[in-house]
C-alpha cells in the first residue's frame, strides 16, 4: 500500500473518510470538493501514483480492502457492473460488515437504465426500459445496493449520470484529435452533465444524507451531438465535422445502442431536493469554460 497500516490509521482517524471504489475521473472531482471540508480519501486504482496528501490509493484486492474498510464513513462506487450486477457487492459484500462507522453509500449508475422513451422527458419515476445488456447490469447493481441499504439501515443514494464531459473529455478534445462525429437522426437528443456538477450533486447528497434516493444528473439542455460539435469548432476556429445521417454513419455497436435510445433527462429533483444550481446549465457554458482554461492561450 506504500505505507503502514499504523500510518493509515493515523491518517484517517476521527475524520470523515470516503472509500471510492474505482477512483478516477469523477472520483477525483468529488475528492477535490470534499478535501476542502477536511475529508480524507481512500481509493482503489491500479495506479498508485495517484496517491496525494489527501487520498491514499490501494489496489482492488481483498487484503487491501480488508485493511481499510473499517475506516470508511462513506463509500462511493464508480466501477461498471458485470453480468451478475455490482462487482463490489459480488466480491466484498461480507467486508462491508466491518465498516462499523459507515453512514452512506453512493452508486454511480447511468441514465441508460431508462432505455428509449421516444424523446420524452424522463424523471426518476419513469419506467426502466433497458435496451442493452449494460443497462440491465446497471439496474441489477442499483437493486443490490438499495436492498443492502434497506437490510442494514444504511443510506444508499443512486446517481443516474447522463453523458459525462469536462476537462480532457469533451468535444474540443475530440475535434483536436480528429475523433468527433456529427450524426443526424431526426428528433434525437442526448443529455449530458459537466463533471464538476456531478461532484457538486454528490457532495450535496452526502450532506443531506437521505436514506434511500435516486437522482438523475443531467444539465438543462438535451441536444443533438452535432450542436455540441458545432460550438466546439466555433471556439477552436476550425470547420465543424460534416453532419452524417444516421443511416449512412459507420458506428460501433455501443454508439448504435446510444442512438437507439432517445430521451430527455429531467434534473428537477436535484434542484428541488438538493437545491443545486448548476454551474454549467448547458454545454455552452461548460465548453466555453473548458476552452478558456485549456485552449484560449494556445491557439
Locations of the language-model features?
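NAD(P)-cofactor binding segment of oxidoreductase domains
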Residues: 70-108
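Conserved Rossmann-fold NAD(P)-dependent oxidoreductase catalytic core, especially the SDR/UDP-sugar
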Residues: 93-133
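Catalytic helix-loop patch of NAD(P)-dependent Rossmann-fold dehydrogenases
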Residues: 118-158
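Glycine/proline-rich active-site loop of Rossmann-fold NAD(P)-dependent oxidoreductases
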Residues: 139, 152-154, 164-176, 183, ...
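A conserved pocket-lining segment of Rossmann-fold NAD(P)-dependent short-chain dehydrogenase/reductase
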Residues: 174-193, 197, 201
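Mid/C-terminal beta-alpha module of Rossmann-like enzyme folds, strongest
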Residues: 208-255
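Conserved C-terminal active-site "lid" loop/helix of NAD(P)H-dependent oxidoreductases
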Residues: 230, 249-277
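Amphipathic terminal alpha-helices
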Residues: 281-299
